[in-house]
Each structure stands twice: as structure tokens, then as C-alpha cells.
Amino acid sequence: MDLSAVGLTVRFGALAALNRVDLEVAAGERRAVIGPNGAGKTTLLNVIAGEHRPTEGSVRLGGRDATPLPPWRRARLGLGRTFQRSTLFSQLTVADNIALAVRARNRSGWRFWPGSEDGLNQEVSRRLEAGGIGHLARRPAGRLGHGERRILEVELALAASPSALLLDEPMAGLSGDERQKTLGRLRSLPKEVTVDIVEHDVDAVFALAEGITVLDHGVKIADGTPTEVRANARVQEVYLGGL
């Protein structure tokens, strides 16, 4: 599913968190949004997901105007996301968190699973193994380490079988091994799944993204391939430095 934003402006009083930002992510593209702290990256994801209403501008998902739609309607269109802050059910086990996400996708709550309970259990097991967290299945989410929680959050977003996935700093706080595991998981996603990732881990961005959008103080300052962005003098000045 393609997604686009045109002329997005978000004002909080006199502050413009976004100022006429355009974004185009083609269906199946892996795109990253980078920039310094306070650049407006998370605000951009929040507007695309429907968490914030733009002061000006519009959002389209799969060619449809999604600007007036609440988050749950956008999710029904196939949009999934993760957040900077944890959204796990800490008292439930890792497996139960994933099971709940799968049931939500099927709009079945806890009471009904289309087909059989075996079907649910099999899908949960597949997703645990795909995320490399099968050994944590019975552990309460509240007892996970920070990196383990981040990995589970990615798996919860994927359990919704999204057509487009918004990821907000999925590498934050991960160990080297966890980082490689998450990067491999994202690389293995079906090509038809669109990925838009906000991330400070520049090495991960350049390893994953086909296109990169750079924000600074709410303004888009660059947009292009990783090679083009790395060579951009303005991006070097405000963000990449000597990388």
C-alpha cells in the first residue's frame, strides 16, 4: 500500500512541529525518515497514523484520502505502527500479547477464533519464532528487557498483517545481537509490505532503506536515495557530520 502526505503542517501554539512537509512512499518501498532530535519525525508518523490531526495538509493511504479518519479506521485500511514508548500488556505473557494482536486483526477479541484454537496457537508460534523470541513465549511482558520489549512490539505490529508499517525507532536501546536480529526481520518482510521507519541508527537506516527523507526543525531538507542523502551538504551539516 502506498502512502503520501501533502503540505503537512502541525502547529502547537506558535511552534510549527511540521511546516508544509511532503512525503511519498511507494507501495512496497522501504523508506526512512531521519533528522536531529526535535526535527518532527515522530510528529510526522503520528499524523500519518491519525494520532494527530494536521493543521494543514492531507494524508492518503492506498490512494484514499485518510485525513479525516481516526487511527482504528486507518488500521482497517492496512496501516500498522510501533511507538517510541511501550504499548505492551505487561501482565500478559509474550505469547498472549501476540495472540491478542492476532485476534484483534480478526476482530474476534478473546472469545472466538475463526477456525480453531489450534490455528491461533500455530500462528502465534510462527510469529514468535520469526521474531527470534520463541524462548520468551511464557514470560510476562513486564519482565522483558528493553531490547526484548522492542522486538516484541515489532512482532505485535506485524501480527496485524499490515500493508504498510510505520516504525518509530525500533533499534533504540537494542544490543548488537538484537539490532541484527531486528534488521534481519525487517529485511525478510514480504516485498509488498511498505515500510516507513523513523530511526537514529544511521547504519541501520542505510542498510535497510531504499529512500530517505530528512527533516530539520519541521522542514524537509532532503529526499533521495541513501547515496544522494549521504552526499548532501545540508544533511552533512545538520545531521550526518563526517559519516
Model-derived segments and spans:
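Glycine-rich phosphate-binding loops of nucleotide-dependent enzymes
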Residues: D2-L243
